[in-house]
Amino acid sequence: MFHIIDSERDLKILDKELMLSNHLAVDTEFNRKGKEEIELCLIQVNNSEETFLIDCILLGEYKNNCKFLFSKDVKKIFHSFREDVEAIYSWTQSKLENVFDSQVANSFL
């Protein structure tokens, strides 16, 4: 089951819920416009129980409602996160905290 988050009200509620998580799986979808410009379209988040699809296009301008992404207390697990981080930064103008990249971890096995 998944939930589409496309309103500020729903995103505020979700943010509070996700701030209580120890870890989250995160992925993004984005549109790259040339070499330098990137537009974040969707953030997919799973908290081991449910999946949430945050529609960044419908939400429009970032209004500081994804605090879970920047919390040192919540580990964010990505796979090959280089472009995901770039896309999230393009929307929020903030750097992620406490991230784990499974692709990098695999290279140590």
Residue ranges, per PLM feature:
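Conserved RNase H-like, two-metal-ion catalytic cores of nucleic-acid enzymes
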Residues: M1-L109
